[in-house]
UniProtKB/Swiss-Prot annotation:
NCBIfam families assigned: gcvT, PRK00389.1
Gene name tied to this protein: gcvT
Record text on subunit structure and interactions: The glycine cleavage system is composed of four proteins: P, T, L and H.
Functional summary from the UniProt entry: The glycine cleavage system catalyzes the degradation of glycine.
One GO MF term attached to the UniProt entry: aminomethyltransferase activity
Transmembrane stretches, start-end: none
Statement: the UniProt record of this protein carries the keyword Transferase: yes
Official protein name in the record: Aminomethyltransferase
Protein transport recorded as keyword: no
Documented EC number(s): 2.1.2.10
Reaction equation(s) it catalyzes: N(6)-[(R)-S(8)-aminomethyldihydrolipoyl]-L-lysyl-[protein] + (6S)-5,6,7,8-tetrahydrofolate = N(6)-[(R)-dihydrolipoyl]-L-lysyl-[protein] + (6R)-5,10-methylene-5,6,7,8-tetrahydrofolate + NH4(+)
Length: 375
């Protein structure tokens, strides 16, 4: 199978990146040292090519009403242009089709950023719901492989770390209006060399920073200028350890179409209180929460916490969904779906290679803004 490539593929290879198949995309896992890349994001600034993710623009007078029924979170929270919201998109059974970010720019102009592996299915689902509801929303994917004729393909570079914003401003003075942005807000600026840049104060690392949505034809220039400014290229390996430390779910690993957001630690993104109806609401209300989604820290030596390992508790068995060795904590950490009777602070047993090793149940996240929140 031929892998898809982002517009930065040649640059990754020129930098000596180790490339892997990530959901059908040829992506860099690291550029030599995953731990150094991780630490650069925690202490300074690193950048990630996330152009495999897909921007989807939604336009039309009924866009807000359409999204009110499409998403589990309530887009009525979005009243200020540029404001963003994290949400799940559910099927009728309450399973997670995808988790995404929705941006509001005007009543007839919203933007979604969806995951790479689910993008084609997401677009098909959104179009089907649009047809079924007669909303008349114009749906325009902006990733190169799915953008329609006449739509400028877009790419995304995430610049993350305590010094990320300053380095972006110094490299691209046109982005200075983003200085006033609060987290989960975006602004669109025009750069004379790059063109239109959407600067979003969002990310997937637990650090401050920006996600820059730029014309795909100019993303190489963005990357090279940031590289010259001392922003360290970082791959999927560091991205995974950073997001795990930050307590951020990965679609396909921590939740999927067979998982309720209530069982994946995402109840805070689901609006069950208002009278608004949305796809999957009735199923969620009927099922309720059946499992907890909590963190684990391995206490015994002799293993690393990994996905699918069994967790033995006094309240019954659970399962790890994501696990890794944390560079920031120098400990093995994990997310786990656990029975409702388990409490933070409990000691549980994790089955690792025919051994049972002790782990402590903790509240997520493990690390945020460079500071350990657990011990």
């Amino acid at each position: 199978m031929t892998l898809q490539a982002t517009p930065l593929n040649a640059i990754h290879r020129a930098l000596g990146a180790r490339m892997v198949d990530f959901g059908g995309w040829d992506m860099p896992v690291n550029y030599g040292s995953q731990i150094e890349e991780h630490n650069a994001v925690r202490s300074d600034a690193g950048m990630f090519d996330v152009s495999h993710m897909c921007v989807v623009d939604l336009n039309g007078a009924n866009t807000r009403a359409f999204l009110r029924g499409l998403l589990a979170n309530n887009v009525d929270k979005l009243q200020t242009p540029g404001k963003a919201l994290y949400s799940c998109m559910l099927d009728e059974k309450g399973g997670v089709i995808d988790d995404l970010i929705v941006y509001f720019f005007a009543e007839d102009r919203f933007r979604l950023v969806v995951n790479a592996s689910t993008a084609l299915g997401d677009i098909e689902w959104i179009r089907a719901r649009n047809d079924a509801t007669g909303s008349g929303v114009t749906i325009t994917p902006r990733r190169g492989d799915v953008a329609p004729a006449g739509a400028l393909p877009l790419a995304i570079v995430a610049v993350q770390g305590p010094n990320a914003r300053t380095k972006v401003w110094n490299t691209f003075p046109s982005t200075q209006p983003s200085d006033a942005l609060k987290p989960f807000n975006a602004v669109v600026v025009h750069d004379p060399a790059i063109g239109e840049i959407m600067v979003a104060r969002t990310g997937y690392t637990g650090e401050d920073g920006f996600e820059l949505v730029v014309p795909a034809e100019n993303v190489a220039a963005v990357w090279e200028k940031l590289d010259a400014a001392g922003v360290r290229p970082a791959g999927l390996g560091a991205r995974d350890t950073l997001r795990l430390e930050a307590g951020m779910n990965l679609y396909g690993q921590d939740m999927d179409i067979n998982t309720s957001p209530l069982d994946a630690g995402l109840a805070w993104t689901v609006d069950l209180q208002s009278e608004r109806d949305f796809t999957g609401k009735a199923a969620l209300a009927a099922a309720g929460q059946r499992q907890q989604f909590l963190g684990l820290i391995l206490r015994d030596k002799g293993g690393v916490l990994r996905a699918h390992q069994k967790v033995v508790t006094a309240a019954g068995d659970g399962e790890i969904t994501s696990g890794t060795f944390s560079p920031s904590l120098s400990q093995s950490i994990a997310f786990a779906r656990l029975p409702m009777g388990v409490a933070v602070g409990d000691t549980v047993q994790v089955e690792i290679r025919d051994r049972k090793l002790a782990a402590t149940v903790v509240k997520l996240p493990f690390v945020r803004n460079g500071k350990a929140l657990v011990s």
